[in-house]
Amino acid sequence: MTPTHPAPQREGERGSLHLESTASGITLITGADHAEVLERALRLRADGGIPLIGDERWSPQRRAQILERAAAASPEEGIGWAACTSGSTGTPKILLRTPASWEIAYPGLDRLIARAAGWSTTAGRTLLLPVHPVSSMGPFAAVHAAHSGMRLRVPRGVRITAEDLAGADLLHGTPWHLREVLDLLDAQGAFSHRLRVAVIGGDRVDPALRAEAERRGIAVLGYYGAAELSLVAVDDGSGLRAFPGVRLRVRRGVLWVRTEQAARQLIGGASTLRREESEDGVWLSVGDRVRLSEDGVLTLCGREDQAILTAGATVTPEAVEAVLLASPLVDRALVYGAPHPRLGQLVAACIQPSSAASELSERRLRRKLRAWCARRLDPAQRPRRWLFTAALPRTPSGKPRRLRPAEVADLPPWTPS
């Protein structure tokens, strides 16, 4: 049975909607009104189309790259959704998946939510979705609301307001969004709310954040997943365990997953998703390092690719470095995650400028590199902190050596000639 798609609740208009169809059948949808974007994507899917939600903040060059990738795609039979993801070279990639790969997760997720909230069902509840819809978390949650008979509410601005929160029963977002909600409740004093569950992905939930939410009567379901794999494991406060229907295996410290939620195709380059077939089925890995206890509790130990988690987005350092190194003003570049109390990490860039930058001041160089990145990278990928050094250390193979933030701070400063 095809679920109906009620229009998401909007608190105000935020701009016009842009739809661009491609020869492959994929339609790019962008707009500043995220409720309208999600509503149109759901309608397009119900009509048999393949929605690809974009970012209204993209530069014209970035938008053209995405459209070129989408037009060149050859979607397999049954593909119903497309989502943008960042490649390791800085070029955009598009994930294609079947509707069933998301829908198979919703009954298990509904049971977890209902149990955490003390409800008999999630139907009829209102889901607050503050995530930018360019993230696959956005359309995943919007389809979830439609599939399970929930009302969808999308904030009208970048920040969550008391008006957005009023009447919301559950939140689907990142730790950053949960922090916003708790700060809002603190600021509003006696403000009454009915939020009972926060479904949180994109980064780990800090124990202190979970405890603060629970004191407010908000149960937290933190989950670990990946754009390629969807939901992998969930933590209701007792530890991160396999999501219903998902099997986990650890080999040489790396997590492998057996799941029916996996994306079907990747357009725009080689996939970083590893695939192995065995007697008990197909196992997939995105290279996350983990520990798995005897009683099934999963502990995340980082990514093999040193991925940066910032405000719920996953950024591969190599993707940003590739764009920086293409600038004539850059000789070497090192991108890393700088700790941030609210966002988890900030994308930071340590640059060894080339001789072409010798006559620029540090301020002008930073401004030029920011403009360079704005035309070529998604907003989440763009460096927010900049450091310029006279010498970036190299590995024996000649690549910049991966450094800890404390080591970066000790590098010799760059001074223009």
Predicted features along the sequence, with ranges:
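Conserved pre-ATP/AMP-binding loop-to-beta segment of ANL
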Residues: 26, 32-33, 70-84, 116-127
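ATP-dependent adenylate-forming carboxylate-activation enzymes
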Residues: 31-35, 52-63, 130, 150-168, ...
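Conserved adenylation A10 loop of the ANL superfamily
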Residues: 79-96
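AMP-binding/adenylate-forming
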Residues: 97-115, 126-181, 221
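Gly/Ser/Thr-rich phosphate-binding loop
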Residues: 183-238, 247-249
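Conserved ATP/PPi-binding loop(s) of AMP-dependent carboxylate-activating enzymes
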Residues: 242, 251-282, 303, 313-315
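AMP-binding/adenylate-forming catalytic core of the ANL superfamily
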Residues: 281-282, 287-381
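AMP-binding/adenylate-forming catalytic domain of the ANL superfamily
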Residues: 375-399
